[in-house]
Amino acid sequence: MTAVSQKTTIPSANFSLFRIAFAVFLTYMTVGLPLPVIPLFVHHELGYSNTMVGIAVGIQFFATVLTRGYAGRLADQYGAKRSALQGMFACGLAGAAWLLAALLPVSAPVKFALLIVGRLILGFGESQLLTGTLTWGLGLVGPTRSGKVMSWNGMAIYGALAAGAPLGLLIHSHFGFAALAGTTMVLPLLAWAFNGTVRKVPAYTGERPSLWSVVGLIWKPGLGLALQGVGFAVIGTFISLYFVSNGWTMAGFTLTAFGGTFVLMRILFGWMPDRFGGVKVAVVSLLVETAGLLLLWLAPTAWIALVGAALTGAGCSLIFPALGVEVVKRVPSQVRGTALGGYAAFQDISYGVTGPLAGVLATSCGYPSVFLAGAISAVVGILVTILSFRRG
């Protein structure tokens, strides 16, 4: 390839990467818009307990983790673009299930069941979307810029959470759950149309090691990622109820604060994992996350809680790409999609387990206790990361 063609190819790939990331933003609004609303809908409108709130939120992540293997194989064997577009379509179907839950004149258990069906479909769609877009982006710009690909995808995801949380509460309070569901149904279809003309990358060929051998290569960074994920899971599941229990307003803006600092860190410092390696960046990030969660635990006012959420977002921001760089180093190219899917599955498991367990903890010890549990998990994550990579 000539120097001229390289100069034209790199901007073209970067523009395609931007289009993919923007489509992720649109699609992930199906997660961001309902995230602060579902706890209120389940607890206040349907009359269920904190544990059921945790199940309603967390079950999506179990669906995601159970389909990560399929998503990775699909991306590796049949192409990442197919996986990504399939995920966008599935996320739109989740909105349709929630629309039925809102409009059908049925009992609370049936509405809850439809809500759960939508969450399961969303989990399936999310696994296809994120595994597909990460593998697609790596195919466009190359593994040496894996940190950039993960950073851009993360900015899209948490930008959607930052924008979606207050917007979701606004739509719900003014127009109801049906309007929220309809919005989440339309946005992924717009993303699908936006990405339709982005060039696909070829599926990888070559000998494929078994799934368990891939897991054996990635479990150390995966465990660190899982322990980080507890903090976001408790914020996403219980922050709305925490604010309501204290008589505070602005609950939706906690996710805006979290997502805003998350995106800002990716913009300003997303290059660090590629430059300095993942382990150092991950340890510092986990320290910042711990500080934010402790602030949420002790917050005497809504404003202090917002600062805690912002600090937590800043801490969580670089952990996925930081430890993800270590994953890409450890696996052959033909199973990169499977490896990234498996790596992300550790976070999905963390999200899925945290919701119900934190619900039991909140009922027994109060809502602040879940943020203390998140901080303890982050500290354990620091120890695990240091011990796991001390020879690396």
UniProtKB/Swiss-Prot annotation:
Its main location: membrane. The keyword Ribonucleoprotein does not apply. One of its GO terms (cellular component) is plasma membrane. The keyword Cell inner membrane applies. CDD domains: MFS_YfcJ_like. The chain crosses the membrane at residues 22-42, 46-66, 97-117, 121-141, 151-171, 174-194, 224-244, 252-272, 276-298, 342-362, 369-389. It is found in: Cell inner membrane. It is a multi-pass membrane protein. One of its GO terms (molecular function) is transmembrane transporter activity. Keywords: Cell inner membrane, Cell membrane, Membrane, Transmembrane, Transmembrane helix, Transport. InterPro entries: MFS, MFS_dom, MFS_trans_sf, MFS_Transporters, MFS_YfcJ. PANTHER family: PTHR23517:SF1, RESISTANCE PROTEIN MDTM, PUTATIVE-RELATED-RELATED (PTHR23517). Belongs to the major facilitator superfamily. YfcJ family. This is Uncharacterized MFS-type transporter YfcJ. It comes from Salmonella choleraesuis (strain SC-B67).
